[in-house]
Amino acid sequence: MKIALASPPYPASVDNALYQAEKLIQSAAPAGAEIICFPETYLPGYPGLGYDTGTTTQEMLESALTRVCKMAAANSIAVIMPMDWHEAGRILNVAQVVSAKGEWLGYQTKNQLDPTEDNKWTPGTDRNIFEVNGVKFGITICHEGFRYPESVRWAAMKGASIVFHPNCTGNNTAGKQLTEWGHQDNPYYEKAQLLRAMENTIYFAGVNYHFKYPDSASALIGPDGTCIAHQSYTEAGVLVAEINIDLASGSLAKRFKPALYNYG
């Protein structure tokens, strides 16, 4: 299976995000990608980065999701679209999953929030496994994938061949220009993603925005911890790479003995 990891610029608005999303989807589908993933809360854009993303209502978000479903169907490609979502008086940080036929398959919530996000979202409580064209996958969103490896181990133990990791690391105002993926002087993010793959013997796909000062690049990491491909630090775009589910054995995840660890 070929997958696509989108690295768009930070959106100016929901409409701008949808415009960019359609362009990247239209680029990924002809390259043979069967699923494309976007960065964390791409709709309307991760808050607190100095941009005014405006006020979004649930009606606006539902309309945006409908447009994403139409894009998926028009291009015959499944889509993982992270976004805000209003539910029962709460605002959730979710990743919506849409089939290549434009059918809504469900969403994964961000369950472990960064401490700085407690006033932005309500944490979710459920974890889910999704399946597209016979490939099972999980989703872990930003902080929880970096800091809580259990979120990835759970998916691997449930049979996921790959875990997608939409995230937001970096900014456009100040920072360090990265040049080499996984370099020892880079922020820890890429190294954490490498570990999530190899400690579970599955694929791990990090998906970040294109920033002037990124702290990580969108990348596909193999079950042995090898970075198979990554997006350029200096260019927006979409990365298309192939996975071989026969290599994603999940062997190390299957050896985990949860009974040895009592968190109560």
Regions found by a protein language model. Give the residues of each.
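Short beta-strand scaffold segments in enzyme catalytic cores
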Residues: 81-83, 94-97, 128, 218-220, ...
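Cys-nucleophile CN-hydrolase/nitrilase-fold catalytic domain and related Cys-dependent amidase chemistry
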Residues: 14, 22-101, 173-198, 202
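Extreme N-terminal starter segment of soluble prokaryotic enzymes
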Residues: 1-4
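Active-site catalytic loop in hydrolytic enzyme cores
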Residues: 86-185, 191, 247-263
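Short polar catalytic/cofactor-binding loops
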Residues: 7-13
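Short beta->alpha transition motifs characteristic of CBS
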Residues: 44, 96, 107-114, 219, ...
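CN hydrolase (nitrilase-like) catalytic-core segments centered on the catalytic cysteine
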Residues: 60-80, 146-236
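Short, acidic/polar
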Residues: 16-25, 146-153
